[in-house]
Curated annotation (Swiss-Prot):
Signal peptide feature range: none
Keyword Secreted attached: no
InterPro entries: Cyclin-dep_kinase_reg-sub, Cyclin-dep_kinase_reg-sub_sf
Keyword Endoplasmic reticulum attached: no
Protein name per Swiss-Prot or TrEMBL: Cyclin-dependent kinases regulatory subunit 2
This protein's UniProt keywords: Acetylation, Cell cycle, Cell division
Cited function: Binds to the catalytic subunit of the cyclin dependent kinases and is essential for their biological function.
Gene Ontology terms for molecular function: chromatin binding; cyclin-dependent protein serine/threonine kinase regulator activity
Organism in which the protein naturally occurs: Mus musculus
Homology family: Belongs to the CKS family.
Length: 79
């Protein structure tokens, strides 16, 4: 799978977390489990590449090809 077909959003923030979403090509999205959130090992196996600390935190039912990730902000950046 060519990684250039995977789209990575810009990061966005709230008081506690930074977020990003990752859009998979439709064919690749068929490999996303429907019963659980993916571990880092699972999403890396799909070809998603991002730095350490990101957690797949929510399944977006209407668009399962969009993976939602978050990671805690460093304590000094939290409000």
């Amino acid at each position: 799978m060519a990684h250039k077909q995977i789209y990575y959003s810009d990061k966005y923030f709230d008081e506690h977390y930074e977020y990003r979403h990752v859009m998979l090509p439709r064919e690749l999205s068929k490999q996303v489990p429907k019963t659980h959130l993916m571990s880092e090992e699972e999403w890396r196996r799909l070809g998603v590449q991002q730095s350490l600390g990101w957690v797949h935190y929510m399944i977006h039912e209407p668009e399962p090809h969009i993976l939602l990730f978050r990671r805690p902000l460093p304590k000094e950046q939290q409000k």
